[in-house]
Amino acid sequence: MITSGAIANEKVLFSRYVDTDNWDMLVLLDFPSPAKAAQWQAQERDNPAGLDQDALKLISAISTYPLDLMQSAAATTPAEKPVYLVLPYDYTVSPDEYIAYLRDYVRPQAAGWIEEGVLASYKMFIGRDAGGRPWSSVLLLEYKSDEALGQRAAVIAKVRAKLRADPSWKAISDGKQSVRVERAAILADELK
């Protein structure tokens, strides 16, 4: 599908651990235009998730969630052995307020994690028509390696300590529990 131009980019992630309450495989598809996304919708009518009948026989559940990419950034050097941390959230404020939260609270942290050399990239998505879904937004963190992921807690603490010097960032940090609810994080590897 990528070679036909219907899909601009795809990423296939597999959860590292067995978890009956979460997904085993996550496929992120980027469409180059709304028209191409509409073509995919037509494809899904005949082939759910784009899978043929033989593949569908192997699957017990499929869910499709249209998402909008709100923000993203990447380090100048790509990860050689990336590890993905998928963080689903439900936001409890208006979409505009949540987008401001992503811009003013999450983005400075993710930029710091990239600067510290542990994060290769991040993407922040908001679900379309998220009512009734298990989550309404997703933060996709691509760590450079397992070693980089192991430094996560220390790097988060270091970056947040720097950011707390900014009173506006600190105010958002202090009130973040009223903005979103974090769901179960999923550690995943990419199928290449």
Language model: regions and residue ranges:
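Short S/T/G/P-rich N-terminal loop/turn motif that feeds into the first structured element of a domain
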Residues: 1-49, 54-163, 172-192
